[in-house]
Amino acid sequence: MARMHARKRGKSGSKRPPRTAPPIWVEYTVEEIENLVVKLRKEGYSTAMIGTILRDQYGIPSVKLFKDPDNPNRNLTITRILEKHGLAPEIPEDLMFLIRRAVNLRKHLEQHPKDLHSMRGLQLIESKIRRLVKYYKRKGKLPKNWRYDPETAKLLVR
């Protein structure tokens, strides 16, 4: 499949092995995993970093291999665990990381206004932000009146 803002295909990467149940060597229960996720979030880690720590230090390859105790038809996710405990960020993390990139690029362009390649990169990043905002408004993760504004984005990122 082609990239979003390029006409070429990406490099192939490794594929996760197809599993429906946790491996035998995982000795943690669902409650222990939830407690670990909450503990790591309170220490200030992002959801991606929590997943990496669970994989590398605790031997849990993926939280999605475990069934959600509240709804057995769904699998657990780190975001659902954080929402259940009231620790989820108000702005979704992928959107926040894109906003952070845009703010840093704007800061660069203030010092180097003739950097046209970076200007184009900023346009592409802000297109992705607008696309994600539209999606999150439709899903109800963001309020309907939320708008991306570069000036208020500086205050969001800090």
UniProtKB/Swiss-Prot annotation:
CDD domains: Ribosomal_S15p_S13e. SMART domains: Ribosomal_S13_N, Ribosomal_S15. Keywords: Ribonucleoprotein, Ribosomal protein. InterPro entries: Ribosomal_uS15 (IPR000589), Ribosomal_uS15_arc_euk (IPR023029), Ribosomal_uS15_N (IPR012606), uS15_NS1_RNA-bd_sf (IPR009068). One of its GO terms (cellular component) is cytosolic small ribosomal subunit. The keyword Ribosomal protein applies. Residues 1-21 are annotated as: Disordered. Transmembrane segments: none annotated. GO terms for biological process: translation. Residues 1-18 have a biased composition (Basic residues). Pfam families: Ribosomal_S13_N (PF08069), Ribosomal_S15 (PF00312). GO terms for molecular function: small ribosomal subunit rRNA binding; structural constituent of ribosome. Part of the 30S ribosomal subunit. Belongs to the universal ribosomal protein uS15 family. NCBIfam families: PRK08561.1. This is Small ribosomal subunit protein uS15. The lineage of its organism: Archaea, Methanobacteriati, Methanobacteriota, Thermococci, Thermococcales. The gene is rps15.
